[in-house]
């Protein structure tokens, strides 16, 4: 005997999780502004990316962003901005959608980058160069927002997060 299906067929949900952050570092302002890209040495080997990483237990997203910048580049930021956007993508191996709040940090020309072992190369590039170099469409969409709202003109002060 077939029982009637109420409210349509049974559906399978997939999880949506937020356990990581994405950080764009910017040098300069206007059309000549540059962003830091790093080449991955292990996971997704050979692809270029911005700073990204996990939120550790007990951390806020902005604390994780500052820590990841320090770990991956050796740069200690005094201020970070909420990017006012989330990067999102589907992870088939985990059957989930990942959301990552985006943050932005500004770096002076004299600041030196010191990579950890997650990356084997870095380059400061203009935003058009960065768009051409990154692999994923979601990165490009997020980068376009960051360029428009943070590199072409000073950001809104209400997005500022003071770290010290």
Kindly label every feature range from the protein language model.
Residues 74-111:
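Active-site segment of metal-dependent pyrophosphate-handling enzymes
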Residues 44-46, 115-164:
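Nudix hydrolase/Nudix homology domain
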Residues 31-71, 75:
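Conserved Nudix-box catalytic region and its N-terminal flanking loop in Nudix hydrolases
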Residues 49, 97, 124:
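Short aromatic/basic micro-patch
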């Amino acid at each position: 005997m077939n029982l009637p299906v109420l409210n349509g067929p049974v559906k399978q949900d997939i999880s949506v999780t937020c356990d990581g952050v994405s950080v764009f570092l910017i040098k300069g302002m206007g059309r000549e502004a540059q962003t830091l890209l790093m080449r991955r040495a292990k996971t997704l080997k050979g692809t270029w990316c911005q700073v990204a990483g996990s939120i550790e237990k007990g951390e806020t997203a902005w604390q994780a962003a500052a820590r990841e910048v320090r770990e991956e580049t050796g740069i200690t930021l005094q201020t970070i901005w909420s990017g006012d956007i989330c990067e999102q993508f589907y992870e088939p191996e985990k059957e989930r959608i990942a959301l990552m709040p985006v943050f932005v940090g500004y770096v002076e020309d004299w600041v030196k980058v010191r990579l950890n072992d997650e990356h084997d190369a870095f380059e400061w590039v203009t935003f058009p160069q960065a768009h051409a170099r990154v692999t994923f469409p979601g990165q490009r969409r997020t980068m376009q927002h960051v360029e428009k709202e943070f590199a072409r003109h000073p950001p809104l002060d209400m997005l500022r997060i003071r770290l010290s």
